[in-house]
């Protein structure tokens, strides 16, 4: 399958590597805007001769290569426009580190721990105009210790699960065996990010007010050696 990946860091790299090694044609990638330190996903793409088409912040449908069949969002933290999604035969999918519709938003792992959930997991869902609100293709559940774990420990558990789920989802889509399930809005929650800016929507006229409120910031982790989604020094 011809796949375009929007992602970043270790998770984006792991998803890119898995799909590339499974024989899929990667038509391009879109990482976040690059700073002094090169993103790990970008480094792997350059090693394999995969084109960095645009950064996520400026991605529009014109930048999606012709013939792309599927967009995969792998820890991108950017809204992908509906025009980009519509350009692809199978649209787009994303991995979210919670059991949607619970904990929509950019900091699902942190909020899972903060709210003392005993159950978490991962979701593969259809990308669309609603943040983390698309139909569900796959879900995996895990039990957690909300009083003994921190967000890093939960993410370390969900990381490999997420990579496996993306791989499985692509195979399901390729085989035409998709069964999509709508999210039950009765149980939906949306929490704001602790540290990240509000989502930017390219190619979309935004009407109405903001959906995010201010939240107090967690202290930066000083012990974590993992290239995770929480440590500013690894961004």
Question: What are these model-derived regions, one by one?
Answer:
Residues 1-235:
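One-carbon transfer enzymes
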């Amino acid at each position: 399958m011809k796949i375009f990946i929007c992602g970043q860091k270790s998770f984006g790299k792991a998803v890119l590597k898995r799909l590339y090694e499974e024989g899929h044609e990667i038509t391009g990638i879109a990482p976040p805007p690059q700073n002094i330190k090169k993103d790990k996903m970008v480094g792997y793409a350059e090693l394999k001769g995969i084109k960095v088409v645009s950064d996520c912040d400026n991605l529009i449908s014109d930048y999606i290569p012709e013939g792309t069949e599927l967009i995969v969002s792998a820890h991108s933290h950017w809204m992908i426009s509906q025009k980009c999604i519509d350009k692809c035969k199978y649209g787009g999918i994303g991995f979210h580190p919670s059991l949607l519709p619970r904990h929509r938003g950019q900091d699902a792992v942190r909020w899972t721990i903060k709210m003392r959930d005993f159950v978490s997991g991962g979701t593969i869902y259809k990308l669309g105009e609603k943040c983390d609100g698309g139909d569900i293709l796959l879900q995996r559940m895990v039990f957690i210790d909300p009083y003994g774990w921190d967000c890093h420990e939960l993410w370390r558990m969900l990381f490999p699960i997420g990579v496996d789920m993306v791989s499985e989802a692509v195979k399901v889509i390729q085989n035409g065996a998709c069964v999509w399930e709508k999210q039950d809005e009765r149980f939906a929650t949306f929490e704001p990010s602790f540290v990240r800016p509000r989502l930017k929507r390219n190619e979309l006229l935004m009407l109405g007010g903001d959906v995010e409120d201010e939240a107090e910031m967690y202290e930066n982790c000083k012990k974590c050696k993992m290239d995770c989604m929480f440590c500013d020094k690894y961004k």
